[in-house]
A protein has these predicted regions:
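Positively charged n-region of N-terminal signal peptides that target proteins for export
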Residues: 1-3, 417-418
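N-terminal capping/linker segments that flank leucine-rich repeat
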Residues: 3-5, 15-112, 129, 144, ...
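Solvent-exposed strand-loop boundary residues in beta-sheet-rich modules
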Residues: 55-59, 96, 119, 140, ...
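Conserved hydrophobic position(s) of the canonical leucine-rich repeat
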Residues: 87, 99, 110, 120, ...
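Conserved hydrophobic beta-strand positions in leucine-rich repeat
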Residues: 90-92, 111-115, 132-136, 153-157, ...
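Canonical leucine-rich repeat
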Residues: 100-102, 123, 144, 165, ...
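C-terminal outer-membrane/trafficking sorting elements
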Residues: 345-418
């Protein structure tokens, strides 16, 4: 009898220790559909952390490491499910209609909240100042307040019903995806660290990305934009601005650009010719660039594209393709030459006129068989951006990276500014 009592005491102490290991003051609560399996994936503060999942009479304690545990199903025996313990990152994605509400206000240390593809109508993250990642896309959110989440790096809230989004307090954001909502205005001027911005399929009328100098991907397709200036986004690699009302684009300062989808806009043949001439030169082993100025061969804009001189793009190692099937556009009839819009034909291989270095960073030197009276440099739109008189060199350090035309006493050649 004494042995039994001693054993019972040991068992009680063991379970008491186990229970004490769970931090019951730190928890996340879900509103769930009773009788369903709820899929969860957990990441704890430290390896071997005890976490308790409670729903009705169903209680289960699991050991969680400081890495994803792989998703497991937990039976919802009631309309709520509470996850107790030091959970650092929480994933309840892909439960569809089985998760309708989420409350993480009692887990102030939470760094990652991943709750996409449910039917959640509201999320309060005002008590989660340590949050780094919030992925709440594919839900039913009408509002989202992230003003208290100043450490946020990644925000994905696409496919909800948001009419506005304020990210002015989230200066650490590097990725923002608010696509497929009902947003009419988006201010990203404070988000100077953004490298990826996805805001397609909204109702945005203007988009200023001049402060987002680290952008590599910009997707603003299917909005109400009439203009787009990417001159400050010198590291931009991919641009998707299709389905707007944009009338002009200039890529002369986007030396890293490799993919452009600009179909279904207000781009004329002349503007498209200028766009081709402003594309960065990807010859010399660079990956071939792709530009999609038209959706398919049946599109009303196809005749406009065929009226351009596609050779100006292919000469820079760019393929002009239909967006829908990735096939090359052929049959161009245009004759426009990339001369900066000045009406002067580009002169090549003139022995009496040479420039160096090319590409150039600062000082451009010019050698001719006669004294140079005037030097004029034009961008791809024909705007003069630099000039000098009675000189054999010109300082171009102030010019943005891109392609320019140099005119020296009637002779013309092209340079690349690094």
């Amino acid at each position: 009898k004494r042995a039994f009592i001693a054993l019972l005491a040991i068992v009680c102490v063991y379970f008491s220790v186990q229970a004490a290991d769970v931090n019951m003051s730190r928890y996340i609560t879900l509103k769930v559909k009773k009788g369903t399996n709820i899929k969860l994936d957990l990441w704890a503060d430290a390896a071997g952390t005890q976490v308790k999942i409670v729903s009705g009479s169903n209680e289960q304690t699991v050991k969680v490491d400081s890495a994803w545990t792989h998703s497991r199903n937990y039976v919802a025996e009631a309309g709520t499910m509470t996850i107790y313990g030091n959970v650092l990152r929480f994933n309840c994605c892909d439960n569809n209609a089985n998760v309708t509400e989420l409350n993480a206000s009692h887990n102030a240390q939470l760094q990652g909240l991943f709750c996409s593809n449910n039917t959640i109508t509201s999320i309060d993250v005002s008590k989660n100042p340590e949050l780094l990642w919030l992925y709440c896309h594919e839900n039913s959110l009408a509002t989202l307040d992230v003003s208290h989440n100043t450490k946020l790096k990644g925000l994905r809230c696409y496919q909800n019903t948001l009419t506005s989004l304020d990210v002015s307090h989230n200066e650490q954001l590097t990725e923002l995806d608010c696509s497929e909502n009902k947003i009419s205005s988006l201010d990203v001027s404070k988000n100077t660290l953004l490298t990826k911005l996805f805001c397609l399929k909204n109702a945005i009328t203007t988009l200023d990305v001049s402060k987002n100098t680290q952008l590599t991907i910009l997707d603003c397709g299917k909005n109400n934009l009439t203009s787009l200036d990417v001159s400050k986004n010198t590291g931009l690699e991919e641009l998707y601005c299709f389905g707007n009302s944009i009338a002009t684009l200039d890529f002369s300062r986007n030396a890293s650009l490799k993919s452009v989808s600009c179909y279904n806009n207000k781009l004329t043949a002349k503007v498209l010719d200028d766009i081709y001439c402003s594309l960065p030169d990807r010859k010399g082993g660079e990956e071939t660039g792709i530009i999609n100025p038209v959706l398919n061969a049946s599109s009303p804009d196809n005749s406009i594209v065929l009226a351009t001189n596609g050779k100006n793009a292919t000469a820079r190692n760019w393929q002009i393709q239909y967006y829908e099937d990735d096939t090359d556009v052929t049959g161009f009839t245009g004759t426009h030459q990339c001369v900066g819009g000045t009406g002067i034909d580009e002169t090549k291989d003139l022995p009496a006129f040479s420039i160096y270095p090319n590409p150039v960073k600062d000082i451009l030197n010019i050698t001719t068989d006669k004294p140079v009276h005037s030097i004029h440099i034009y961008n791809t739109y024909g705007t003069e951006v630099a000039h000098a008189t009675d000189a054999t060199s010109i300082d171009v350090l102030h010019l943005p990276a891109g392609v320019y035309m140099v005119h020296a006493d009637g002779k013309v050649t092209r340079i690349i500014k690094e």
